[in-house]
């Protein structure tokens, strides 16, 4: 189980990458790798935080009154839309690491 402090650290890392990508974009520089990393980190941080929240609440996490189950479902969407984490990893492998195209 991911602890709340770990979820917080992941969210802060994602936020910092978002800021770096935005700064590069505003400066007119290429930010493809940073933007993709930001999306990947944010999606993973969101999923980890939702999982921790659900685990902390136990069975009550599935009760509709607490909205936890809805947030849990929504965080899954961030890993698939608008671009899946698998495609992000493929982009990073090809454009950052110089590996051959894998899809």
Question: Which residue ranges define each predicted feature?
Answer:
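Alpha-helical interface subdomain recognition
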Residues: 3-103
